[in-house]
Amino acid sequence: MATFMTEDFLLKNDIARTLYHKYAAPMPIYDFHCHLSPQEIADDRRFDNLGQIWLEGDHYKWRALRSAGVDESLITGKETSDYEKYMAWANTVPKTLGNPLYHWTHLELRRPFGITSTLFGPDTAESIWTQCNEKLATPAFSARGIMQQMNVRMVGTTDDPIDSLEYHRQIAADDSINIEVAPSWRPDKVFKIELDGFVDYLGKLEAAADVSITRFDDLRQALTRRLDHFAACGCRASDHGIETLRFAPVPDDAQLDAILGKRLAGETLSELEIAQFTTAVLVWLGRQYAARGWVMQLHIGAIRNNNTRMFRLLGPDTGFDSIGDNNISWALSRLLDSMDVTNELPKTILYCLNPRDNEVLATMIGNFQGPGIAGKVQFGSGWWFNDQKDGMLRQLEQLSQMGLLSQFVGMLTDSRSFLSYTRHEYFRRILCNLLGQWAQDGEIPDDEAMLSRMVQDICFNNAQRYFTIK
C-alpha cells in the first residue's frame, strides 16, 4: 500500500520519478496569469498568521467550508478572528478527501513551511498554527520571500485598463526585487456593454485617459492611451473573462456610434446590438495586441454570481460561480477569423471552464496557427474547476491527441494566494507521470534526453519564449 504524499507523490514509475525530480522540480516558475495584489508584492506584505495567508480571499476553501455546513461568519465574517476561521478550516479538511483541496492543503504545508509528516486536521491544527506562525514572522516568509523560496521568476497580475499601475512601477524601480511582476490588461468592463455599471465605468475610463467618450472612435482613442500606459509598464498580455461568447459582423462606425449613444442614454440594447459592439471592441483590441506583440487570453464559460442573496451580501469572486454550458464553437471561430483574415490575430491562449469544450478548443487552435511562432494559438491549462488531477490530465491528453503537447505553455496559478505556487508542483508531477506512463507502456520512446527537453519546455521554457516580445 502506498504512503500518502511522499517525495514520489503521483509518480508511479521510475521514468516519471526521474523526469520530475531531475528535470521538472528544479525549473523556475513562470506564472503568467494570477490575481495576486501588486501592492502586496510592492510592500512585501508580512502575514500575521497562517489563517490569514491561507484563507483570506480563497474562494476554493470557502466553497468547501460552506459545503461542510460551516457558518458564514467563520468563512468571511469581519468580526471573526483569523484563528477561529483557521480552526473551522482544520475541522473541514478531513472531510475534503477526494477533493484537490486535500492535496493542495498538504502541499502548501510541505512547501514552503516544511511540514511533511503530519496530516492536517483538528488534532494537529494547534501545533501547525504555532510552527507556521513562527516562520511567517521571519523575512523569508514575506510575500516576496515566499515567491523567492518557490523559485518564481515571473508573475502576470490581472489589471483593469483604468489602473494606475503605480505598484508595478514601484516594483520595477526596486533593484532588490529579482522577480518580474508584469501587469495584464483585463478590459471586461469595456466590452461588456450590457452590464449595469457600463456607463459609470466609461466615466472612469474618460478620467483615466483624459478623453471624452461619446463616439466609438473616442473609445478607441481612450483605450489606445491606456494600452500605451500598460505597455510602458511592461505589459505583454491581456485577459478576457467571457461568460457568453457573442459574435456579429462588425458594423460601420455610424452604427457603433448609435449603439453606444443608446447605451449612454439609458436605452435597452437588442441582443444583436450587444453582439455587434462586443465583437467590434474585441476585434479592435485583438489587432492592437497583435501590433504590440502581446498575448491575448480568453477565459470562456463561467456562469457567475449565481446566488443573488450572497452576491448582495459579499459581492463577486466569493465562491458562487460555476460552469456554464453555452455553445462556443461557431462564435469563437468567427471571432478569431475576424482578426486572422487581415493577419492581425495575436498570440492567443484559449481556456474553457466546461470540459465538454476541451476538444472544441483543442481542434480550434489548429485552425489559426502562424508561421514562425511555435504554438501561436494555445489550448490553455485546465482552468478553475478543472485545475485538479482529472482536469489537468484531460487537458494534457486531449491537447496531445489533437495538437502538439510539446509546444504547450504549461501551468498558471490563476490564484489570489501566495501559497498557491504548489499548483505548479502538482501539475508537474501529473505531467511527468503521464509521460512516464506512456513511455513505460511503449507508446512513446523511453528517451531521457527527448523527454527531459519536453518536460523543461512545458514547465518553463515555452512560456518564457511565448511571452517575450520580439
UniProtKB/Swiss-Prot annotation:
EC number of the protein: 5.3.1.12
Pathway in which the depicted protein is active: Carbohydrate metabolism; pentose and glucuronate interconversion
Organism: Salmonella paratyphi A (strain AKU_12601)
GO annotation (BP), single: D-galacturonate catabolic process
HAMAP family: UxaC
Entry-linked PANTHER family: URONATE ISOMERASE (PTHR30068:SF4)
Catalytic activity: D-glucuronate = D-fructuronate; aldehydo-D-galacturonate = keto-D-tagaturonate
Disulphide connectivity of cysteines: none
Uppermost EC category: isomerase
Gene: uxaC
Family membership noted in the UniProt record: Belongs to the metallo-dependent hydrolases superfamily. Uronate isomerase family.
UniProt keywords, alphabetically: Isomerase
InterPro entries per UniProt: Metal_Hydrolase, Uronate_isomerase
Protein name (database record): Uronate isomerase
GO molecular function: glucuronate isomerase activity
SUPFAM superfamilies reported for this sequence: Metallo-dependent hydrolases
